[in-house]
């Protein structure tokens, strides 16, 4: 695979997800925000999208960085983007940026980081054959 194609396949997905998050953040607030299940769904979405974003950044960075640095960079990018996303929402009519959303986003990124570390830190089991 050529280097430009490889870079696009690695960096394209996290950048595309960030663009999607930005687009959703630019939408004005709707009126049913006080319905409990809509509130819950949005918080689960915050957690999930940033968990996915962290995993995608890890995937993009793992060949260039050691495991711990790739995981930390993924979390760092996610938290920084969560902060800027909430700041962006303060500029949109009917939207407010909140620190608790940043914390939910960070929790999603940290959950993904924990799963990634757990997955890549486990020793590979070698199947023993008995002859």
Model-inferred region functions:
Residues 14-23, 71-90:
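Small-polar-interrupted transmembrane alpha-helices in polytopic inner-membrane proteins
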Residues 15, 40, 47, 56, ...:
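Residue-level signature of the transmembrane alpha-helical core
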Residues 31-39, 83-106:
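Interfacial helix-loop-helix junctions of multi-pass membrane proteins
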Residues 49-64, 107-120:
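Membrane-interfacial alpha-helical segments at the cytosolic side of multi-pass membrane proteins
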Residues 118-128:
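Membrane-interface capping segments at transmembrane-helix boundaries
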């Amino acid at each position: 695979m050529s280097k430009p194609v490889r870079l696009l396949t690695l960096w394209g997905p996290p950048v595309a997800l960030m663009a999607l998050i930005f687009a959703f953040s630019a939408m004005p607030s709707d009126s049913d925000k006080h319905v409990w299940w809509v509130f819950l769904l949005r918080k689960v979405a915050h957690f999930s999208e940033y968990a996915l974003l962290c995993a995608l950044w890890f995937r993009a960075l793992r060949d260039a960085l050691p495991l711990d640095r790739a995981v930390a960079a993924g979390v760092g990018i996610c938290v920084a983007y969560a902060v800027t996303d909430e700041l962006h929402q303060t500029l949109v009519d009917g939207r407010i940026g909140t620190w608790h959303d940043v914390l939910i986003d960070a929790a999603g990124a940290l959950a993904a980081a924990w799963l990634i570390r757990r997955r890549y830190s486990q020793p590979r089991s070698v199947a023993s054959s008995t002859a």
